[in-house]
Amino acid sequence: MAKKNTVTGSKIKRKRQDESPEVSESEEIDVQGLIDDEASEDSEDEVESEDQVFENSDADSDEELNNLIGEEEDVSDVDSEDFSDELQDDSNSITDKLTNVRIRTSSQSSNENVHGLFADGTERIIKPEIEPVYDSDDSDHENFNTIGNIPLSAYEEMPHIGYDINGKRIMRPAKGSALDQLLESIDLPEGWTGLLDQNTGSSLKLTDEELELIRKIQHNENTDDNINPYEPTIEWFTSKTEVMPLTAVPEPKRRFVPSKHEAKRIMKIVRAIRDGRIVPPEKRKEQQDEEQYNFDLWDDNTDEPNEHIMNLRAPKLPPPTNEESYNPPEEYLMTEEERKKWEETDPSERETNFIPQKYGSLRKVPAYQENLRERFERSLDLYLAPRVRHNKLNIDPDSLIPDLPSPKDLRPFPIKCSTIFQGHIGRVRTLSIDPSGLWLATGGDDGTVRVWEILTGRQVYHCDVVDKKKDDDNIDSLEWNPDASVGILAVAAGESVYLLVPTILGYEIENAGRSKIEVGWGYDTYGNKNKRGDLNVNGEEDNESGANEVKKEVTKWLTPMEGQSQQGIAAIIQCRKAVKNLSWHRKGDYFVTVSPDSGNTSVLIHQLSKHLSQSPFRKSKGIIVDAKFHPFKPQLFVASQRSIKIYDLSQQVLTKKLMPGARYLSGIDIHPRGDHLLASSYDKRVLWHDLDLSNTPYKTLRYHEKAVRNIKFHKGRLPLFASASDDGSVHVFHGTVYDDLMTNPLLVPLKKLTGHKVVHSLGVLDLVWHPKEAWLFTAGADGTARLWTT
């Protein structure tokens, strides 16, 4: 029967081929060509004619089929209506597909049909293979409007909305009146989206198919009609339980006899246990416990994880930044000034340990020279810095902040710069205020001493202490005599100390000062030439007991030359080494000088009335940096690099030794009450010592960014102190000392004064308070002195 069907099918196809109209090469289908409106009308006529031909050919084929069936087969075997229906359905499906397709013709043939045969002998049409070229993919199909990513809002004021592929304008579609637009916004049409079509400029609406797809997605319905959710299940296993076995073969004898093969395998395991190749779990645990205490000290076994709770992993290195790129942005590259500053900075103080560089490509980047050193330092950090686990403390942060009064309630204190004293060439290293508070004396690298009137800022006195053409010494320290009736100014420059009496103080003060200095010349001539040591600076009369041994002459008191005498220099003290600091006793007859390079004669005490100089120490441990007298006790404070010693001059004994904990002290100052001391250091610290409390600092203040050069208490009744640093700033503090020994001093930061420029890593070099007012004078490396007032 199947053979007959195939025969009839082949005959029907041959008949159709004979009756089908011939198609010329010029009318073959080509969907790639573009046609105009007239060609489209012709193509529609051709489609209609082709539909009629298809219908006629189908009718003729049905009649011929019925005749063939009647000749070869019976009606009971094959139903001719089935064949006719199938053919009719096929024809209808083809016509339905062709009715909605616009067929375009071209002059050249692009699709040639090749006829062949199936395996059963039927003919087949061999179509050309589709070449997967770029033109066959329309995923990146260009839009009709070629404006790209430009928004349509850019064309709102223009009559067109863009341009097509040929550069012609795409005109904007006509819009309705304002009433129509209002009605459309109220009554939304079906398929309304509120979007604009970029190709046409009109509102974008959804089709019925898209609306139906959205409805199915909202209702969780099946979006593909070809999928049947109710397909019949395939029962791979039957649900019926079989009672009888599929086979009733009796069990063989080998099922009930021990297996020889298993016996061999068991004996093999037994021999392994006897030989020790297989260890039972109990013995294995015992061996592991024994091996736990036996390990190789030099074994590099890093595979075993050590996940103990107290083991802390090494911190990870921070990720590289843009500065470390081989092609960093321009703003990360250093300028010539920044590069020079980076090279002059100490390696420990540099922000980065490399200079950002830019290369054209990665292959041009050379080897990193500091890689080995950085790895070594990383290893040292991990080896020498043990990691410690700290438990977090549940402490209220507000309780850690001291309850300090407001700075507004602690006025007066300096807040602004009122006067700038400018006249020195180079750095201004030191300055001092006379006891009356009217005159300011400054000394600098130019070797001159200048006296300024404080109220007007006018220079009233000038003295060339050092001749820069012959000597390179600088004026390192100067200080007025605390006795306002004499007007003596002591100046330390190089290895000499000059005693000046400025000619601006009036005849009486100038005469009293010169007379006090000249009295010493007579004692030096007719007095004790052996210059016995006398450390009792508070005594009214000399103690000439023979217990003190005669000391060698450590200084020379010289008379000035005529030119120096005309400038106001009354006496010159020649020392062995350069003098860096000097300080007067409160009575004005003694002053102490410090020469750090002079060894055991680093500290010298000079007596003005007798022209005597003596060294109170036979040996000196360490480098002496500063020395001060106690405000009212016969005590001398001597500061070395790391310690501060307090000597009793009347008993000539060491009374106390303070350990500030700093690496290199720069200066000290004593509170007017005498029971507190301030020390400054080059490692950015300010240390407050309570002399009645302990040898260690009561407070250590770290607020400066660079070395602290000097620190001073206010000598009047104001509880103020200030510190000067190389960062160019001056910090003013309020420090109240109470009579009650059980109450700690009150330290409150008040103001940070900035105005001096940092020159060659040097900022503010010295400072001094006004004896009566809350005024502060500072000397900077920028060649100026400044007055800070309230």
UniProtKB/Swiss-Prot annotation:
Region feature (Disordered): 1-93
Keywords assigned by UniProt, alphabetized: Nucleus, Repeat, Ribosome biogenesis, rRNA processing, WD repeat
Region (Required for interaction with YTM1), start-end ranges: 371-407
Region of interest (Required for interaction with NOP7), ranges: 255-371
WD repeat spans: 423-462, 470-510, 574-616, 619-657, 660-699, 703-743, 759-790
Molecular function GO labels: large ribosomal subunit rRNA binding; ribonucleoprotein complex binding
Keyword rRNA processing: yes
Keyword Repeat listed: yes
Bilayer-crossing regions: none
Comp. bias regions, Acidic residues: 20-89
InterPro entries (alphabetical): BOP1/Erb1, BOP1_N_dom, WD40/YVTN_repeat-like_dom_sf, WD40_repeat_CS, WD40_repeat_dom_sf, WD40_rpt
Stored Pfam families: BOP1NT, WD40
GO cellular component, as recorded: nucleoplasm; PeBoW complex; preribosome, large subunit precursor
Chief location of this protein within or outside the cell: nucleus
Localization (cell): Nucleus, Nucleolus; Nucleus, Nucleoplasm
GO biological process, one term: maturation of LSU-rRNA from tricistronic rRNA transcript (SSU-rRNA, 5.8S rRNA, LSU-rRNA)
Role noted for this protein: Component of the NOP7 complex, which is required for maturation of the 25S and 5.8S ribosomal RNAs and formation of the 60S ribosome.
Subunit structure: Component of the NOP7 complex, composed of ERB1, NOP7 and YTM1. The complex is held together by ERB1, which interacts with NOP7 via its N-terminal domain and with YTM1 via a high-affinity interaction between the seven-bladed beta-propeller domains of the 2 proteins. The NOP7 complex associates with the 66S pre-ribosome.
Family of the protein in this entry: Belongs to the WD repeat BOP1/ERB1 family.
HAMAP family on file: BOP1
Designated name of the protein: Ribosome biogenesis protein ERB1
Organism: Meyerozyma guilliermondii (strain ATCC 6260 / CBS 566 / DSM 6381 / JCM 1539 / NBRC 10279 / NRRL Y-324) (Yeast)
